Design a protein with these regions (language model features):
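PAS-family sensory/regulatory domains
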Residues: 275-284
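Polar/charged side chains located within well-ordered beta-strands of beta-rich proteins
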Residues: 224, 250-252, 258, 281
Length: 284
């Protein structure tokens, strides 16, 4: 048996952990804005989804399967709770009523999933069946062939988030932010394509395992590259501005008095500034 799926999911979870730490530390150091904080949280939820899904594929008992899938759905609820807000921050398209309504829906589904005996995924206690992949790997069959009403409501919420994200990307492109919109468009295409593939799998149209995990990872990877590129460009532009500023040790306030502006440059230039601080041109 050649194990490909499970090791790949653990490898992707490592990348997600790195992205969450990278963006989280950058936010704590105040090198980037709140959009990166949302992205760090998204990365953490994708990490949780990958780990719980990988565990569910290897579940040995039915209670273990139900518990892992319950926590997987909880992480998915958190992902789609945060995702529209991140899209709003990235594109500048902020329909407040939709964002608040979407958040309310996912908080409700999060609570219901934890309260139901078998979670949102299962109507009754599932059986432990297996799926043989083309390359010989055997995993637990996670297809949801009998769906609860809450599962369908969650699916409707996902489709609504998809529609909003595509609309926001389109508006962003029309506003002239072509590079940003193209990067987001590619990420959304892979992300939503994998979700639609999941829907086809759950309805028995395709005999395969879910691919949404790859879509989550593709979204994270592409947008991480784009956001890091923007941060580097912003830092480079700031350095260019600072490099063109004349070095200054003291500046004048509104009343014409000299005030210390750059102690480090004063030490570098070996300048004696104590005789002019607080004075005007007429006092020197």
């Amino acid at each position: 048996m050649t194990a490909i799926l499970i090791p790949s999911m653990y490898a992707m979870s490592g990348v997600c952990a790195f992205a969450a730490l990278h963006h989280g530390i950058a936010v704590m150091q105040r090198r980037v804005g709140k959009l990166h904080l949302l992205f760090a949280l998204l990365s953490a939820t994708i990490l949780a989804i990958l780990l719980t899904k990988a565990g569910a594929y290897q579940a040995l008992t039915i209670p273990e399967l139900v518990a892992l899938r319950r926590w997987e759905v909880a992480a998915i609820c958190l992902l789609f709770l945060l995702f529209p807000w991140w899209v709003a921050g990235f594109t500048g398209v902020r329909p407040r009523a939709f964002l608040l309504g979407s958040s309310t829906l996912w908080v409700l589904l999060f609570a219901i999933n934890l309260g139901l005996p078998y979670g949102v995924q299962y109507v009754d206690l599932p059986s432990l069946t297996y799926f043989d992949l083309p390359w010989g790997e055997r995993v637990v069959d996670l297809r949801v062939l009998q769906r609860s009403i809450w599962h369908n409501i969650g699916l409707l919420g996902i489709l609504t988030a998809m529609a909003y994200s595509v609309h926001a990307c389109r508006v962003q492109f029309r506003r002239g932010q072509h590079r940003r919109a193209r990067a987001l468009g590619w990420a959304l295409g892979l992300f939503f394509g994998s979700i639609l593939f999941n829907i086809a799998v759950n309805r028995g149209l395709i005999e395969f395992v879910h691919l949404s995990d790859l879509g989550f990872f593709a979204l994270l990877l592409l947008m991480d590259l784009e956001m890091m590129r923007e941060s580097r460009d912003q830092n480079r532009r700031m350095r260019d501005v600072l490099d063109r500023l004349p070095p200054a040790i003291c500046l004048k306030n509104l009343h014409g008095h000299f005030q210390l502006a750059n102690l480090g440059f004063a030490h570098l230039a070996n300048a004696d500034i104590h005789g002019i601080l607080g004075k005007t041109d007429f006092d020197i």
